[in-house]
């Protein structure tokens, strides 16, 4: 029987569901990652998957099919651990595992982004992320190894805006969100990270208290940026120092930690801007 992850292409096939049906009959458990031509092939595949009542995800032209229950080689629970605890605990566990083995991670919401971003940056493959419905999440990760990239000219297409001053410097606070808006207009993808005193901007209602006569209320700029899909992270350690948690966190903001921060800084296509 075929187990774990199998990737294949069905481009050019008139009825890709026929091939997938044959593969499913020889698959006990695991994930099938299918690269398609597009909408028509995806519709053909979806009919088959609904017939078998199988869970699946569509990401662009790729269909990821879940078959059975994937069994992990090891499990670790990091619920309650604060940054950088979760990623260090998981990294230690992975260091004792072989490439290709599966680790099941149970974590809280605060460490979810850190773990998925950090683990991908280390060369591992995130197989599945599942909301358990009780405030915890289940991550299945396949151990891999980071491949050395050859030096090449990389186009800068992302901006990583880091604010460390928060409400203590209104000028830099305004600049943080205005710069993100300008980046969007220049076809750059902006991401905002609030750390140290910058974390004060993440306290619910705090941005609405900042207003300069020449500009709109800071809170309005923040909501506008969020509505355009810009991610705003706040450092978990800085948030904890200032008593900021999920209960008083500004809507739309996400708590993240060192792995997320370092993963962005390590991307060759990202230009960091410190404020």
Curated annotation (Swiss-Prot):
Protein name: Uncharacterized protein MJ0760
Source organism of this protein record: Methanocaldococcus jannaschii (strain ATCC 43067 / DSM 2661 / JAL-1 / JCM 10045 / NBRC 100440) (Methanococcus jannaschii)
InterPro entries to which the protein is assigned, alphabetical: DsrEFH-like, Sulphur_relay_DsrE/F-like, TusA-like, TusA-like_sf
PANTHER family: SULFUR CARRIER PROTEIN MJ0990-RELATED, SULFUR CARRIER PROTEIN YEDF-RELATED
Organism phylogeny: Archaea, Methanobacteriati, Methanobacteriota, Methanomada group, Methanococci
